[in-house]
Amino acid sequence: MEFRDSPKEAEFRAEVRSFLDKEFPPEFSNRPTEWGLFNAAGRMSGDFAGFMRSWTPKLNERGWGAPAWPKEHGGGGLSVTEQFILSEEFAWRRAPRPGGIGHGWAGPTIMVYGTEEQKQEFLPKIISGEHHWCQLFSEPGAGSDLASLQTRAVRDGDDYVVNGQKIWTSGAHHADMGILIARTDPGAPKHRGISYFLLNMKTPGITVRPLVNMLSSHEFNEVYFEDVRVPASNLLGEENRGWYLAATTLDFERSGIATSVAHQLIVQDLRQFANESRVGRANVQRNPALRVELAERAIEAQVEGLISYRIISMQNRGEIPNKESSIAKLYSSELDVRLAVTAMHLAGLHSQIVDRDDESAMGGRFPRFYMHSTTSPIGGGTSEIQRNIIATRGLALPRA
């Protein structure tokens, strides 16, 4: 594994840094919680929303809005290492990149399995930001065991009629399109008989109900389908082969360098809090073990980065990082929780005060981070699922 950039990679890294120096307002670097997140009202702050309207076209001009996409589809056509460098440099500046379900999941899956008509219809609107996408996979009783889903899609002439329910759908309340898996052959084994659809979220019969979390944030939703008609032309791939498409989609979700950098930035923030704030200094002086705890988190964040480097190295050799991706996901999720606990220890009683209270620590970020971290071992595949993958595929242990 080579840690140093080649001359070509160093030139690209310098290009990215120069772009950020010129185009990215440094005042936004201190507001990382806004990137990709919506407030309780479901709207971005006005100044940030205005910035993104001018920022996204600048990225698309360079192909950086979708760096992994081929150039013929409006992407950057970057190598795996160049994508890694771009993600790393943007993460250190806390600079936003277009992303989400459309860029990361729907688009790549359409490129692999879509017809030419589907590619021409949907891919340009993902790149331009005209279409925002959501993922309609999980159901009550079909989360980790996704193949147990019960939502039905029945062929009726030139349409499929969909009935059922999805849950934990991020961003459904502002999505234009969704990737939907539904059962089209209830008599087939559960991993078969599932089909994959590209769904217009404005179709009559779709009801989106908010799920407000303990942070008073509206990110997740329940989505109900009542006789929703989906054109057969929006079936992606073959009927009853949707499970294999869904597996491809989920393969695009990986723990990358951006998460490691985010954790290293949190360590920097905590170190600054310990050195400069009255509360942080007092707690560290009373409890020297906090120094050790913070040092452990700093080391673990560095290790997380090395795991990401290993995955990139494997991809450059044409290898599939199967168990390694699970190792990265497990390590990152568990570190998220440990970092949040360390932050709470560091702020002491002040860690319980939220938002803009005068007595809150760092604007109330500590309790929000702590509560949000509890979702990390669940989203994107639970820690238990990752351990099973590591055991069976990595250690060749028998299934329980």
Q: Can you annotate each of these PLM segments?
A:
Residues 30-39, 279, 284-291, 302-358:
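C-terminal helix-coil-helix/basic helical segment that borders enzyme active sites and/or dimer interfaces
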Residues 1-100, 121-128, 256, 351-358, ...:
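Amphipathic, small/basic residue-rich leader segments at the start of a protein or domain
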Residues 151-154:
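A structural signal for short hydrophobic beta-strand segments in well-ordered beta-sheet cores
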Residues 158-159, 163-209:
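A short core secondary-structure module
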Residues 129-137, 181:
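A short, Trp-centered hydrophobic/proline-enriched beta-strand micro-motif
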Residues 206-304, 376, 392:
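Glycine-rich beta->alpha junctions and the first turn(s) of the following alpha-helix
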Residues 98-117, 143:
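N-terminal glycine-rich flavin-associated loop
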Residues 2-5, 81, 85-86, 105, ...:
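Glycine-rich phosphate/cofactor-binding loops in nucleotide/flavin-utilizing enzymes
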